[in-house]
Amino acid sequence: MKKYIIICLTAYLSGCAQTPLNKETNSGYAEGLFEGAQLSDIKNRFVFACNQKGYSIKEANDNKVVCSRTMDGMSAIATQLAIGNSYSTTPEEILVFQLARLNNNVHASVRNYRETQMAFGQMSRVEIKNNKTTNIMQSSMDRIVSEYNSKREIPLTPTKIERLN
């Protein structure tokens, strides 16, 4: 009996353990700050990134980009069992990028969902918010932000001759 209790307790406690967050943010979601950016430029970057990863664009405006991709394999089966039933459509992975202009910068955050449609049209949606997923999203966001911030044009300083004129 003692072994059984120890095994159950160990399984329970190890199931509660999470990967630590690589970067703490105010919202708890993956965030990025694009310096000196326009909303339309950042929206286009996220649309491009979604297309490159095989997502389709459901919605794209200056403040929000919604991308989706039909899931496949075991993850689709597990998701369908968790949030749907045998009559549900194949689940979709949905990424929602929210963009906001702050002074001369654009602040972006991303949320991750799984969604399926039940037999009579009811939508079943669940947010995927755990440290592992947040870390993956944050590393992608950091890569996109650093690419943007390193490639943007830096204004040339006037030369000595231009200053004299």
Please place each PLM-identified region on the residue numbering.
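Sec-dependent signal peptide recognition
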Residues: 2-7
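Residue-level signal for mature regions of secreted extracellular proteins and peptides
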Residues: 9-10, 43
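C-terminal motif of bacterial Sec signal peptides marking the signal peptidase cleavage site
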Residues: 12-15
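Ser/Thr-rich, low-complexity intrinsically disordered terminal regions
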Residues: 17-165
